[in-house]
């Protein structure tokens, strides 16, 4: 290895590979990180390349996948972009924005990615590993793979799986999802497609999402171990009722089952939705039911509507127009409706979207300037470079409190002075360009912010939900809701405890 002077051989890296996408790699890494932290180690998460529009911004303004940020929280450390040196952010038509060490470095098609970005990507992965070991000489890397490590048509350009495992001589776990069926074929097939030197890296197998009596798989466990000569380190029970699905706490496939919710929230499911982890704090409120809206419908059943962030704001605005959702959102606003936009959602609530540099999907439309929904008097102009930074501010509305979060967006948004509602529109934060709101004549409020993570601010969230309650003539709550960060810690601890009960990590460490 090229970094031996910074590497403590006692803390051999652990890598979690999967027999497929969605096998449980992300949650397994999250659990291992917390288990090792409790054992007194210094775990640090790492994923060489991730593809996601669910992102986080570190203290230096660097973008990284939210799943690696969550894993860093599990380690009890601050997220940093070298934990996820390559982030690919899909933006439609088989193209992605390429992020290296937190910074946007270009756009690539799937076809050209290997030719243009493979070698630069491998260099940035090695550089990031060196940075981590230089800063943390006693750490143990807990590495997440991506998809299957043996996609034979792609293996020569796979930056995330066996190339990293061999480079680090990592102790690898192979995770498989028994819920999907065919678990024996998944395990044997994956191992058979590996080269002998790759297969030697696999130190254990983990069966994930087992329903029912674990003792019923005793013979299956023995068969796998006899056939592969690799120990089955654990059989993890079905945890989906307790924990979020694969890919970083996303809510897109989750369903709420509250029989009598006090607050009903509708979130617009945009084609290019980004940062859906923004809604985890709402999902964790016992009184709130979330539903995703993907087609035009009467919205009056909802206490408030959220328009989320977007990777392609103009393209998603066109979707709202063509689907009829834009009209339904306007109708809802005239009927005591409450609407909240985040980032791209804020921009779409405005009057005008201008895209002179084709940054936000206007190449799908001959006109580079289109109308927004028009519920806030705001004009957004998209520029060549985007803004990524952490936010430390203070709110003015609906209460005064400290606010933390982060921005990831292209475009500058200003009040549209030609609009009659300008005087009725107020700032939400002391930093004026972070958000605006206005109260409807018909009742209800229209508001939006550039701050991702806004609902993680417990006091602000409590006051905003109470404001919604007032507009819907519901009782306001005097008690404070549980801290979202404490709730997240509880979720991670429970996850680690479940894994600890069913996973022989000491066998792996020894």
UniProtKB/Swiss-Prot annotation:
Pathway: Cofactor biosynthesis; adenosylcobalamin biosynthesis. The active site is at residues 343, 452. Transmembrane segments: none annotated. One of its GO terms (biological process) is cobalamin biosynthetic process. Keywords: Cobalamin biosynthesis, Glutamine amidotransferase. GO terms for molecular function: ABC-type vitamin B12 transporter activity; catalytic activity. Residues 262-460 form the GATase cobBQ-type domain. Belongs to the CobB/CobQ family. CobQ subfamily. Catalyzes amidations at positions B, D, E, and G on adenosylcobyrinic A,C-diamide. NH(2) groups are provided by glutamine, and one molecule of ATP is hydrogenolyzed for each amidation. NCBIfam families: cobQ (TIGR00313), PRK00784.1 (NF001989). This is Cobyric acid synthase. The lineage of its organism: Bacteria, Bacillati, Cyanobacteriota, Cyanophyceae, Synechococcales. The gene is cobQ.
């Amino acid at each position: 290895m090229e970094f031996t002077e910074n590497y403590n051989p006692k803390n051999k890296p652990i890598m979690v590979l999967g027999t497929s996408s969605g096998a449980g790699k992300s949650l397994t890494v999250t659990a291992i990180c917390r288990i090792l932290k409790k054992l007194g180690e210094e775990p640090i998460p790492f994923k060489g390349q991730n593809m996601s529009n669910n992102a986080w911004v570190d203290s230096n303004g660097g973008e990284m996948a939210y799943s690696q940020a969550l894993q860093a929280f599990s380690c009890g450390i601050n997220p940093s972009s070298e934990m996820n040196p390559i982030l690919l952010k899909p933006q439609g038509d088989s193209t992605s924005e390429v992020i290296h060490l937190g910074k946007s470095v270009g756009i690539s098609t799937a076809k050209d990615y290997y030719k243009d970005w493979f070698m630069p990507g491998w260099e940035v992965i090695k550089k990031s590993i060196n940075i981590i070991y230089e800063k943390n000489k006693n750490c143990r890397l807990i590495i997440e793979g991506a998809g299957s490590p043996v996609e034979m048509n792609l293996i020569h350009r796979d930056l995330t799986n066996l190339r990293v495992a061999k480079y680090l001589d990592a102790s690898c776990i192979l995770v498989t999802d028994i819920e999907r069926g065919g678990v024996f074929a998944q395990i044997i097939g994956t191992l058979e497609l590996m080269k002998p030197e790759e297969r030697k890296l696999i130190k254990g197998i983990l069966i994930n999402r087992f329903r029912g009596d674990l003792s019923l798989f005793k013979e299956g466990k023995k068969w796998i171990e006899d056939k592969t000569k690799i120990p089955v380190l654990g059989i993890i029970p079905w945890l989906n009722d307790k924990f979020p699905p694969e890919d970083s706490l996303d809510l897109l496939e989750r369903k709420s089952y509250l029989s009598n919710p006090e607050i009903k929230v509708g979130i617009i499911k945009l084609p290019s939705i980004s940062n859906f982890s923004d809604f985890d704090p709402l999902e964790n409120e016992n009184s709130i039911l979330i539903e995703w809206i993907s087609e035009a419908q009467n919205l009056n059943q909802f206490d408030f509507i959220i328009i989320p962030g977007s990777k392609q704001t103009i393209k998603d605005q066109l979707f709202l127009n063509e689907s009829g959702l834009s009209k339904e959102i306007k109708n809802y606003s005239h009927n005591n409706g409450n609407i909240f936009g985040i980032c791209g959602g804020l921009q779409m609530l405005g009057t005008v979207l201008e895209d002179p540099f084709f940054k936000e999907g206007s190449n799908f439309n001959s006109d580079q300037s289109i109308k927004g929904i028009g519920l806030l008097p705001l004009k957004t102009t998209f520029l060549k470079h985007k803004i990524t930074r952490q936010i430390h501010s203070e709110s003015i509305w609906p209460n005064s409190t400290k606010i933390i979060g982060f921005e990831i967006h292209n475009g500058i948004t200003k009040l549209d002075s030609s609009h009659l509602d300008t005087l009725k529109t107020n700032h939400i934060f002391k930093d004026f360009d972070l958000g605006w709101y206005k109260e409807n004549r018909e009742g209800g409020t229209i508001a939006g912010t550039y701050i991702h993570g806004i609902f993680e601010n417990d006091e602000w969230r409590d006051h905003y939900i109470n404001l919604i309650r007032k507009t819907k003539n519901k009782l306001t709550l005097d008690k404070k809701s549980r801290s979202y960060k404490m709730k997240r810690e509880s979720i991670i601890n429970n996850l680690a405890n479940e894994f600890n009960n069913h996973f022989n990590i000491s066998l792996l460490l020894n």
